[in-house]
Amino acid sequence: MKRGLLSGGAIAAALALGLGANAVDAAERWSMATAWAGGPILEQAAKRAARNIEFLTDNEIKIEVFPGGTMGSPLKVTETVRKGVTEIGHSWSGYDWGIEKTTVLFAGYAGGLNAEQMFHWIYEAGGLELYQQFRLEKFGVIAFPCGALPREMGMHSRKRVQTLEDFKGLKLRTAGAWAEIAPGLGASTVILPGAEVYPALERGVIDAIEWAHLSINKTIGFHKIAKYLIMPGIHQPTAFIECTVNKKAWDSLSERTQKLLMAAGKLTTHKFYQEVGNADAYAYDFYVNSGNEIVVLDDEVIEKAQELSYAWADKVAAEEGGWFAKVLKIQRDYQMAWSNAYKYRDTLPPK
């Protein structure tokens, strides 16, 4: 087996689901549209999802992965898949927030579930079924998680940002709900696809960007063109990446093969989360040694951001009702169920 596909534990997990690989004579050849052209790690996550699908289906399905922008807009992967331009896509559902804001509740947004809560909610508390029903009803695609990330690092910035005053007039690249929430802090927001983020920051078209994690951003090189690393990631407590499948292509598969695709997505989700979390633990010192300045936001900024995030979600729920109000209530009830977790999970930090 090629390194980086499936660990022994991952294969055991698939077998525990009652799934195995079964050779077939002819392969279905699929194309995968992705949102990623902003760094190799996210592209690797898409490729891992494709390889895991191939492995578990014993090559019943073969997938060619295309970089963001080569099979339609990188911010419109869902539409590319729905129309049948490609059979499958790998993206972040929050990019569809302009069509239906409920997407950010499943993708991760400021004030929402953190990574641990999201994992448990999706896989153990009915979140997955709700998410799939929503994506099919509103977007006409089959969807399942194909990657997950812990809290993002914050911002790479050409300007020092620590206080509420520092946010005033800050030109910030972002996406999803934060594009509407951050202006409450005084920032001016712009949405850019991954391929445009680095050159925009390099040329000073924008002052700061939020984009992923310490380890992922290290490979892109944002630290070379922006001196300041602003922490923590108040905008994104987690990010769940998804695979979307064209409905006609999905319906052509046997029930068993459909389950294998879902299993491949779950394996990819856990593996990617573990890889990024592990790499982040070692990436912090890299930035310090590279001469970057680490800036921790003042408590008043963090508190204000949380206040704005809750108010934003309440406003959208009141105005739009429907799916957004339904999912928001379910997630907030789940957050309350976790509100005492620190009492039985946390101890003093290591010295």
PLM features per residue range, with description:
Residues 1-11:
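Bacterial N-terminal signal peptides that target proteins for export
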Residues 1-2, 16, 89, 255:
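Short, intrinsically disordered low-complexity segments
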Residues 2, 22-25:
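Intrinsically disordered, low-complexity polyampholyte segments enriched for Lys and acidic residues
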Residues 9-20:
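Bacterial N-terminal signal peptides
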Residues 10, 25-118, 127-351:
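N-terminal secretory/targeting leader peptides
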Residues 122:
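Active-site-proximal, glycine-rich beta->alpha crossover segments in alpha/beta enzymes
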